Amino acid sequence: MNRMMLFLILSIVVISGADALPKFATRQGAKCQSCHINPTGKGMRSTFGSTYGREELTMTTYKETTDIEEYSPMLNDFFTVGMDYRTLFYYREQNSTSSFFQMQGDLYLDLRLNKKFRIYFDKGLYSGFEVFGLAKVLPLEGYIKLGNFIPSYGLKMDDHNLLIRSGAFFPINPAIASYPGGLGFGQGAEDTGLELGFSPAFLTINVGVFNGKKGGLAGTGGTKNKAIVVRADANVQTDLVNFNVGGSVYNQPNAGSPGKTQIFGGFGVISLNNNLTLQGEYDYLTTYNSVLNKEVTGSILYGELNYLLTSGVDLKLGYEFYDPNLDRKDGSISRFTVGAEIFPLTGVEVRPLYRINQEKPTELNNNELHIMFHFYL
C-alpha cells in the first residue's frame, strides 16, 4: 500500500508542477475508438489514428523529403489494410546473451459490409488471431462486437512485457515461478465472446461475456460459467490538462481449468501541455494456486512518465511492482524502465529501453536492454 501512496503522490506532484497508446489519445483529448477500428483500442488505425501517426508523431527532419503525398491504406471505400511489424534486439545481463526476436508481424483487414457493419481480421506470425463482426447500431454511440478478441481490461498497452499485460518474456524471479507472470491480457489472450460498448458524452463503457478460455478450437468446450469483463472510463479535456480515469473488472468463476480468476483495478492517464504524460494502473489479481492448493491474491502496480522532448522523440521513465501473494512473503518483483520512443520517419519507430529488475528475497543480476524496431501502416 505504501507503493500505491507513492504513486498517488507522484501524480499530484506532476499535476501541480508540470508545464494509443493511451498517452497519445489523452494528449489529443480523444478516446481509443477515435484512433483504432477496434472500439477498445489496439490493432488497425482509423483514419484519425493514421493521420495522427503521420502528421504528429514523426520527426520533421526528413518528413518533407520522404513522405508520400496523399497516402492512404484504403484500397477503396469499403476495404482497408494495415500492419504492425516489430523486431526486438535484446541483451540479458544474467547470462550475457543477446538475440534478435521477431515479436510481431500482424496483418489487419477491415471490410465494410454497409454503413453500420464491418468485419475485422488480425492475424499475426504465431498462434492467436482476432476476428470479429462490429455493428454500430446501439444508442449512445454504442456497438455490438462478436467474435474472437482480447477482452477489454485496463490500459491497453502495446508492450506485452509489462506486468499489467502478459508479463516479462523471460521469468524474472524464480521464487514466484508458481504464480501468474502478469495479468494475462497480452498477445495470445484472445477469447471468444460478445461485447457491448457505449460512449455517451465523455464516458465509455464496455461489457463483455466470454468463454473464459483461449480462443480457437481449444476454447470451444462448453462450460456452465462464463467470464464477465466490465470496463468504464471518463475522458475530460481542458485548455491545460487532459485526463482519463477509469476501472476494470474481470471475473472468471470456472472452478476447473484454468481455475478461478478475478481481477479488478483502476487506471488513469493525465497529460499536461500536450507533452508531459503520466499513466498508471493498479490491480488486484486472485487465482487458484495449484502448488499451495488454494486461492491467492496479489497486486500489480504500473506507472510511466513520458515527456515529448521534440517532435518524434518521447522520453520514458517507468516503474512496476508485483507481489503475487499478499498473505505470504514468497517474493516480489520491482522493475524500473528508462528509454525513449523515437519516430525518425513516417511509419518507423525505434524504442530503446533499459530495464532494471529487482527481486526479493534473492537479488539477481538480470537487467535487460531492449531495442525494438517497429514499422507500421
Give the predicted meaning of each segment.
Residues 223-225, 233-325:
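Detector for outer-membrane/organellar transmembrane beta-barrel domains
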Residues 106-108, 132-134, 195-197, 231-233, ...:
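Outer-membrane beta-barrel architecture
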Residues 29-39:
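The canonical Cys-X-X-Cys-His
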Residues 43, 89-95, 129, 152-156, ...:
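Gram-negative outer-membrane beta-barrel proteins
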Residues 43-44, 75-91, 95-215, 224-229, ...:
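Outer membrane beta-barrel
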Residues 66-72, 113-115, 137-139, 200-202, ...:
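Outer-membrane beta-barrel proteins
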Residues 31, 342-343, 365-377:
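Outer-membrane beta-barrel "beta-signal"
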